[in-house]
Amino acid sequence: MTDASHISPLEQARILSEALPHMQRYDEETIVIKYGGHAMGAEETAKAFARDIVLLEQTAINPVVVHGGGPQIATMLKRLGIKSEFAAGLRITDAATIEIVEMVLAGSINKQLVGYINEAGGKAVGLCGKDGNMVTACKATRTTVDPDSRIEEVIDLGFVGEPEKVDLTLLNQLIGHELIPVLAPLATSATGQTFNVNADTFAGAVAGALKAKRLLLLTDVPGVLDKSKQLIPELSVKDARRLIADGTISGGMIPKVETCIYALEQGVEGVVIIDGKTPHAVLLELFTNQGTGTLIHK
């Protein structure tokens, strides 16, 4: 992290001058920021993120934060002796697990982030997709092919959901009124069943419904990498699909990029995958000429 005391007044003025047109570009716009569990890191990292979110609100940007919590959920499940398994990149969530997931996401991480933002001078409101029926979900389905019979089989993921509908009534009461929504990726079914939703998918659905100017996915990697492990600074949807097809984009990056494509199709102007462990990653992306991470656009 740069020590500001070593930056000359002239350099500080240059940095502020460079930021001005970007601030004007995002004036009164909504930015959805997905803050991944792996990106949270130490307490000071989370507090620095919170200060940056407050800065966005102070510059007339409307930030909406969606947080994950995979590592924290895993830690709690292990502590309670509950075995956790994954399939197709998603945590299989049985009745016992969904209680822990809800407790960690909505009761612990969410309130911690709200506290950090409020401590930094903001007015954060902690919610999850269940509040006000904000996000309605259906049971997620995935399939696998049996290696011997070659027969396609359905994977039972338990209480894992995929967003079906986003009701903006509650969010619209907060956005633009100096309040910062902080959302845990939990949703409810039409019959009231709680679902655990992948945080990237949840953020993409919310950003799409809001027609956000930007969706930022903060993760633990620099962005999308080519086959030489070098950062790809910019991709069109067409290029992204090609890189998925040829295997350049693989593993856990595939669902992230698919979320980006979905959000763009729903009206989000641009989506950026960035390393949340980089100090002030959000500010670097929004307020500097070079940005950071990988920008995906139509």
Curated annotation (Swiss-Prot):
InterPro entries referenced in this protein's UniProt entry, alphabetically: AceGlu_kinase-like_sf, AcgluKinase_fam, ArgB, Asp/Glu/Uridylate_kinase, NAGK-C
SUPFAM superfamilies xref list: Carbamate kinase-like
Function: Catalyzes the ATP-dependent phosphorylation of N-acetyl-L-glutamate.
Gene3D superfamilies listed in its UniProt record: Acetylglutamate kinase-like
UniProt source species: Rhodopseudomonas palustris (strain BisA53)
Stored Pfam families: AA_kinase
EC number: 2.7.2.8
Pathway: Amino-acid biosynthesis; L-arginine biosynthesis; N(2)-acetyl-L-ornithine from L-glutamate: step 2/4
Entry similarity comment: Belongs to the acetylglutamate kinase family. ArgB subfamily.
Residue sites binding substrate per the record: 69-70, 91, 196
Keywords attached to this entry: Amino-acid biosynthesis, Arginine biosynthesis, ATP-binding, Cytoplasm, Kinase, Nucleotide-binding, Transferase
Site residues by UniProt (Transition state stabilizer): 34, 256
Keyword Iron-sulfur applies: no
Catalytic activity: N-acetyl-L-glutamate + ATP = N-acetyl-L-glutamyl 5-phosphate + ADP
One example of a Gene Ontology biological process annotation: arginine biosynthetic process via ornithine
HAMAP family: ArgB
The protein's name in its UniProt record: Acetylglutamate kinase
Coiled coil: none
GO cellular component annotations of the record: cytoplasm
GO molecular-function term, one example from the UniProt record: acetylglutamate kinase activity
First-level EC class: transferase
Subcellular location: Cytoplasm
